[in-house]
């Protein structure tokens, strides 16, 4: 078994969509970044990569590389999913939290879970997504950005093998 922890944050700005978990959320602001700035999917990818000591998303998808400009983070998640499978691992579960003062995200969480589960080819029952606020504190509380945290558990599929 391997455990990974991921974290991501992006600044909120105007004239850009708000995409979380691959869901386009109606809001007057969006997240600014090189890709689609989906902090939830970015945190999940960092957790998965970290569990296998494979670096982070900046290593695999450098912001200096224009082929990742405005790319859907779900496409990047598909790459990470294939990478962990190629190493002989499968996902036990993923637990994530989005930290945002607004908008209210509860209505969109089922679609986020479904999008992530489809890409990872797992049941939605092992994908947890929650949303919380910071009660007006910090940059998320001041509505300057959105953050996400994720933790994952990976299982080694290879019988009688030594963990990485």
Swiss-Prot record:
Free-text remark on how the cofactor is bound: Binds 1 divalent metal cation per subunit.
The organism's place on the tree of life at top rank: Bacteria
Cofactor: a divalent metal cation
Residues the record marks as site: Transition state stabilizer: 34, 133
EC number(s) per entry: 4.6.1.12
Binding positions (a divalent metal cation): 8, 10, 42
Gene Ontology molecular functions: 2-C-methyl-D-erythritol 2,4-cyclodiphosphate synthase activity; metal ion binding
Catalytic activity: 4-CDP-2-C-methyl-D-erythritol 2-phosphate = 2-C-methyl-D-erythritol 2,4-cyclic diphosphate + CMP
The entry's keywords: Isoprene biosynthesis, Lyase, Metal-binding
InterPro entries: MECDP_synthase, MECDP_synthase_CS, MECDP_synthase_sf
Enzyme class: lyase
GO biological process: isopentenyl diphosphate biosynthetic process, methylerythritol 4-phosphate pathway; terpenoid biosynthetic process
Pathway: Isoprenoid biosynthesis; isopentenyl diphosphate biosynthesis via DXP pathway; isopentenyl diphosphate from 1-deoxy-D-xylulose 5-phosphate: step 4/6
Chain residues that bind 4-CDP-2-C-methyl-D-erythritol 2-phosphate: 8-10, 34-35, 56-58, 132-135, 139, 142
Family annotation (PANTHER family): 2-C-METHYL-D-ERYTHRITOL 2,4-CYCLODIPHOSPHATE SYNTHASE, CHLOROPLASTIC (PTHR43181:SF1)
UniProt function note: Involved in the biosynthesis of isopentenyl diphosphate (IPP) and dimethylallyl diphosphate (DMAPP), two major building blocks of isoprenoid compounds. Catalyzes the conversion of 4-diphosphocytidyl-2-C-methyl-D-erythritol 2-phosphate (CDP-ME2P) to 2-C-methyl-D-erythritol 2,4-cyclodiphosphate (ME-CPP) with a corresponding release of cytidine 5-monophosphate (CMP).
Stated family: Belongs to the IspF family.
Quaternary organization: Homotrimer.
Protein name: 2-C-methyl-D-erythritol 2,4-cyclodiphosphate synthase
Organism listed in the record: Clostridium kluyveri (strain ATCC 8527 / DSM 555 / NBRC 12016 / NCIMB 10680 / K1)
């Amino acid at each position: 078994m391997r455990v990974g922890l991921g974290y991501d944050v992006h600044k909120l700005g105007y004239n850009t969509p708000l995409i979380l978990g691959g869901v386009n959320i109606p809001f007057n602001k969006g997240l600014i970044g090189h890709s689609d700035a989906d902090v939830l999917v970015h945190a999940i990818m960092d957790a998965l990569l970290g569990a296998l000591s494979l670096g982070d998303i900046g290593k695999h998808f450098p912001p200096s590389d224009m082929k990742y400009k405005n790319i859907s983070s779900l496409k990047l998640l598909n790459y990470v999913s294939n990478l962990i499978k190629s190493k002989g691992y499968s996902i036990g579960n993923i637990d994530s939290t989005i930290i945002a003062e607004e908008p209210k995200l509860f209505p969109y969480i089922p679609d986020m879970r479904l999008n992530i589960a489809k890409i990872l080819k797992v049941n939605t029952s092992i994908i947890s997504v929650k949303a919380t606020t910071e009660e007006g504190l910090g940059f998320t509380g001041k509505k300057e950005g959105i953050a996400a945290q994720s933790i994952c558990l990976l299982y080694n599929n290879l019988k009688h093998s030594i963990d990485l």
